[in-house]
């Protein structure tokens, strides 16, 4: 089983809140690696196409989207957090440390940390 770190971009079956289906899509690992007994879970936030309507706390991945393993310009959506099983994740790439820092600051602000 692959191990993951905070800042990794992965492909996961991301759950939808409005229906019972799942779609494989990219996500950003925000947990400090695997969590839970035997590190079997990851906390991730959604990555979506830059063509979608922007939400206030979205972060643009920018022109280096291919370097992080994404097929198209994309944004990170910290508002959409999920817990997934690490065995369901496939590695795609990593985001730059500066972008990860901004995403984590957004999440910390919402958690009042």
Listing of model-derived features with the role each one plays in the protein:
Residues 15-19:
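Short, charged beta-turn/beta-strand-edge "cap" motif at the junction between a beta-strand
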């Amino acid at each position: 089983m692959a191990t993951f770190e905070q800042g990794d971009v992965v492909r996961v079956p991301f759950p939808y809140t409005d229906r019972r289906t799942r779609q494989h899509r990219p996500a950003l690992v925000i947990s400090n690696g695997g969590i839970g007994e035997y590190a079997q879970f990851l906390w991730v936030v959604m990555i979506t196409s830059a063509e979608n309507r922007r939400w206030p706390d979205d972060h643009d991945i920018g022109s280096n989207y291919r370097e992080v393993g994404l097929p198209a310009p994309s944004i990170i959506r910290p508002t959409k957090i999920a817990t997934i099983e690490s065995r369901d994740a496939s590695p795609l790439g990593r985001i730059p440390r500066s972008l990860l820092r901004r995403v984590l600051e957004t999440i910390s602000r919402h958690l009042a940390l």
